[in-house]
Structures are given as structure tokens and as C-alpha cells.
């Protein structure tokens, strides 16, 4: 009888505390896991603004003696300067909104056309841009800087969209990236947009 009372009085609380402790650890583990998942979700959805006044990929490559082409990935919102299958530079872009056929970036293989310039302004869109290079329809679809007002001031609300679908169909770039394309990418350079 004394042994039974000893088991009930002493060992039972120890067993119960041990079980509760394991259960508490399980809850702590689940809560920690959920917290980590929530932090990860916030990081996935938090958008880091791209500085449109700087090159988006660091130091530019020397391509004077190289045969390059441009691979535009609309899903990733990046333009890859490639030599063969090797990526030699990556630029952040904004392609067309893709909400209608009028604001979509055409997909396919194109070639840089002879039209290019240091500045344009569209009365219809009330937006302009620096350093434009045509790649389709001789001045309709362009690589160019982030949008600007008629007096050549950056439209910050539009520039802050760099890295997301935001344009009327053109490929927006940081100002230095657009200038580099304007100065370095020759006519007839292949442009693949997918």
C-alpha cells in the first residue's frame, strides 16, 4: 500500500510535469516555426526600392570586342547582357503592365534598330525618358530610362516601380543603365524577350 501511495504521490506528478514540459516545448517549437515563416513571408513581399540613379548591376563590362545579345526576362524583370550563353551583366527593368494589348511588352526575337536618342517626350502619355534605343517598330518599343516630366525631372512614383511591370510596353532601365545601352549596344544586336 505504501508503495502504491508513493507512486501516486511522487512519481505521478513527475510523469505529468514531464509530459507537460514536452508539450510546452512542442508549442514553443511550433510558435518559433510560425514566427520564422512569418518573417520569411514579410521578406518575400517587402520590395526593396532600386536606385534609378545608379547602375543596377555594378561595374559595366567592356563589350567593344564581344558579340553580345540581350535576354529580357519579363517574369524576373531583368535584362541580361549575354555573350553566347554567359551572362556578363544584369539590369533591373520594368516591362509593360500586360493588362491590355496596348500596354504589353511584345515577346519574341527582335533586333536593335537604327533609331536612338538622348531624350524624347510623349504628349499622349505625358512622360518622357532619356537614352532611348529602339528594338521594335522603329521608335515604338524602346529601351529607355525611368520616366520623366516634360522638363526632364524623374517621375519618382514611376521610377520607384523599377523591378515590377509598370511601362506602356517599353523596357525601362535605371538612368545609367539606359545610357550604357544607348552608348554601347549597336544596331542589329539581338534582343530576346520572354
From Swiss-Prot:
Residues 68-194 form the L,D-TPase catalytic domain. A lipid is attached at residue 20 (S-diacylglycerol cysteine). The keyword Nuclease does not apply. The active site is at 144 (proton donor/acceptor), 170 (nucleophile). GO terms for cellular component: cell tip; plasma membrane. Pfam families: YkuD. Induction: Repressed by zinc via the metallo-regulatory protein zur. SUPFAM superfamilies: L,D-transpeptidase catalytic domain-like (SSF141523). Residues 1-19 form the signal peptide. This is Putative L,D-transpeptidase YciB. It comes from Bacillus subtilis (strain 168).
